A protein has these predicted regions:
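Residue-level recognition of single "structural anchor" positions
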Residues: 1-187
Length: 187
């Protein structure tokens, strides 16, 4: 699936351990999770059991999410190039992995969350065009949907993410959902 027009990119760090697999936990040389266990600081990776989920959402349209081993420019570049049409306006936060978007052929604008900037009006018409609030809203919906599952295995996380992406992308189809589901199963 490709997205175009105005696209927002962002990353979120989930919690996905080795639920139901105590042998994997012991192999890593640590005790099982305990309530209120303080984690390590910094950004997440699969090894730290804080897998990064990278998302791209077209404003008013489709979303594409990918589970990554870590978040680096070399990891997101092929994902972005395969998903976003060149020349598209891409909105991000200030994270340095997005620094080369213009070099890759995209019109890039960013907001600086670290400075308290969450939306910006660049053309003075009173509408804040530069923001990643659509993607942040999607992450909020995803977290709310995952919360009742009370922990997810790293092995199953891609299935949960794929299902939620599918549900989000077909939510407006109504009766056309069945043909879309059949098409997905056939391909």
């Amino acid at each position: 699936m490709t997205v175009s027009k105005a696209v927002e990119c962002d990353e979120v760090y989930g919690i996905a351990g080795h639920k139901g697999r105590p042998e994997v936990v012991k192999k890593k040389g640590r005790q099982g999770r305990r309530r209120r266990l303080k984690g390590k600081g910094g950004r997440g990776t699969l090894e730290k059991e804080r897998p990064p989920v990278f998302g791209m959402i077209q404003r008013g349209g489709q979303v594409v999410i990918n589970l990554l081993a870590n978040v680096q420019q070399k990891m997101i570049e092929p994902v972005i190039k395969a998903t976003i049409v060149p020349g598209t306006r891409v909105y991000t936060d200030e994270y340095s992995i997005y620094a080369h978007l213009q070099r890759w052929g995209y019109a890039h604008k960013s907001v600086n969350h670290g400075q308290g900037e969450f939306a910006r009006d660049d053309d003075g018409d009173g509408v804040c065009e530069v923001h990643v609030n659509t993607m942040e809203r999607f992450w909020s919906l995803l977290r709310s949907w995952l919360r009742p599952h009370r922990g997810i295995s790293q092995e199953k996380l891609p299935l949960y993410l794929g299902f939620f992406e599918f549900v989000h992308n077909v939510r407006k189809r109504g009766k056309a959902l069945l043909p879309a589901l059949i098409e997905l199963l056939v391909t």
